[in-house]
Amino acid sequence: MRDKIKLVSSAGTGFFYTTDKNKRNMPGKMEIKKYDPVVRKHVMFKEAKIK
């Protein structure tokens, strides 16, 4: 089952991406390096719940 998640920037800008992930294949928290346009750099994004 694919669940919708939010990827929040670790730079503290409040910028986020939304995506989905397969919980069966990836049971832990997702961490991925992506581009944050607020700081204009690639930073780590960490998984958070969509409220």
Swiss-Prot record:
Pfam family, one: Ribosomal_L33
Keyword Ribosomal protein annotated: yes
InterPro entries per UniProt: Ribosomal_bL33, Ribosomal_bL33_CS, Ribosomal_bL33_sf, Ribosomal_zn-bd
GO cellular component term of the entry, any: cytosolic large ribosomal subunit
UniProtKB keywords: Ribonucleoprotein, Ribosomal protein
SUPFAM superfamilies: Zn-binding ribosomal proteins
UniProt xrefs under NCBIfam families: PRK00595.1 (NF001860), rpmG_bact (TIGR01023)
PANTHER family given in the database record: 54S RIBOSOMAL PROTEIN L39, MITOCHONDRIAL, LARGE RIBOSOMAL SUBUNIT PROTEIN BL33M
Protein name per its UniProtKB record: Large ribosomal subunit protein bL33
Organism of provenance: Alteromonas mediterranea (strain DSM 17117 / CIP 110805 / LMG 28347 / Deep ecotype)
